[in-house]
């Protein structure tokens, strides 16, 4: 340090300012070179594209298609940049969108309806028609709703979960009160899987991807699916009960961006449905699994690709909301259900 000081003191006073200015100029030039260098990540960032921020569960099923969308640059090809905020749980994802730290998130139909009734409407862009499954041991005699009477039933979530509500509605039509005629316990899906394996319950009402894991492991089967329950209630079995939600006012102001996002989603879903090799890259996001479990998850995801949201399906979504307890006089209007332009 003393040696450096002596050198500085030896410089003519009139040259000190020149050296200082020269150093600043060289620093700016060096920074500019870094920015345009082909090895710098920012140089590959498309300039001027609008950014769409979405919160998604790190190990959630929506992350599969959004990661593929980014990997294939379908966002950039459609004129925007997708920015994912990975979160650990559903409350964190909902908080991200309600607080405005992201533009959108994945939510189910009932959440979107509850926000509408609370005075904060969200635009609902269909994501998946997968609701869940009723899973039993392979050798079980349970094959219908009526067979559940007197049985021990594990239910994912709480009493207001869509699967349980639909199941009880169908049972009521058959003169069965499952809350009275069966032994019901509510728990998290992983705990229900373990309870089924330990023979602590006879059947579980669970989310589709937990059902897929069980069936992929072998020894378990679907007694009947949620699609069967929807049919029994005279509803279309292919209803998008999960969607990407965006604050309605913001979505109206950015209608073009929403349209680009929806178009890139359709492209991602089509690629994942049409080419199984795309899924190999996604395996780390799908958890440790055998080949059979992996295939069950892949096939289940593809099977949940929503059909076009026709007038009838939008009407059925509203009827589904009424069945699950929503106020029939305060339903989400059809304008909050996104529909791709022709």
Ranges and model annotations:
Residues 35-46:
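Bacterial Sec-dependent signal peptides at the C-terminal "C-region" and cleavage site
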Residues 25-37:
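Bacterial N-terminal signal peptides
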Residues 251-326:
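Secondary-structure end/capping motifs
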Residues 44-177, 185-186, 202-208, 223:
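Short, glycine-/small- and polar/acidic-enriched structural segments
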Residues 1-20:
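N-terminal secretory signal peptides that target proteins for export/translocation
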Residues 318-342:
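Conserved C-terminal helix/tail region of periplasmic/extracytoplasmic solute-binding proteins
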Residues 77, 228-237, 302-311:
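Short, solvent-exposed loop/beta-turn-alpha elements that line the ligand-binding surface or hinge
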Residues 109-110, 185, 190-281:
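Pocket-lining segment of extracytoplasmic ligand-binding domains
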